[in-house]
Amino acid sequence: MFTKGGLGNLMKQAQQMQEKMAKIQEEIAQMEVTGEAGAGLVKVTINGAHNCRRVEVDPSLLQDDKDMLEDLAAAAFNDATRRISEVQKKKMSAISTGMQLPNGFNMPV
């Protein structure tokens, strides 16, 4: 099935990939992205762990409908979550470049 050298190379490659993944996950955890809604009237900043760091609301919205403000805050958070997920996928896919992974195998994000 595997030759002695082939298995050793596979194990070495797996260890290198694991080290790269740990480094990238640490980088992602330190990142912050900002999602927006209502053409920038509401902004939500989250970190790589999807924890909310900051919410900014344009003062003009404070006189408007409470329901609309709540909807915009949720939309901004969802936008920020989508953005950090895209960054995670992009960084993690860079790890597997050049590796011969089985069809259907996806790197964990």
UniProtKB/Swiss-Prot annotation:
- SUPFAM superfamilies, per this entry? YbaB-like
CC per GO annotation = bacterial nucleoid; cytosol
Instruction: Name the principal localization, coarsely classed.
Output: cytoplasm
Q: Name one Pfam family in it.
A: YbaB_DNA_bd
Which compartments does it reside in?
Cytoplasm, Nucleoid
Task: Note the Gene3D superfamilies from the entry.
Answer: Nucleoid-associated protein YbaB-like domain
Q: Does the keyword Mitochondrion apply?
A: no
Cited InterPro entries: YbaB-like_sf, YbaB/EbfC
- Write one Gene Ontology MF term: DNA binding
Does the entry feature the keyword Cytoplasm, yes or no? yes
Q: Which UniProt keywords apply?
A: Cytoplasm, DNA-binding
Q: Which family does it belong to?
A: Belongs to the YbaB/EbfC family.
Q: How does it assemble?
A: Homodimer.
Q: What does this protein do?
A: Binds to DNA and alters its conformation. May be involved in regulation of gene expression, nucleoid organization and DNA protection.
Protein name as catalogued: Nucleoid-associated protein BU482
Task: Report the source organism.
Answer: Buchnera aphidicola subsp. Acyrthosiphon pisum (strain APS) (Acyrthosiphon pisum symbiotic bacterium)
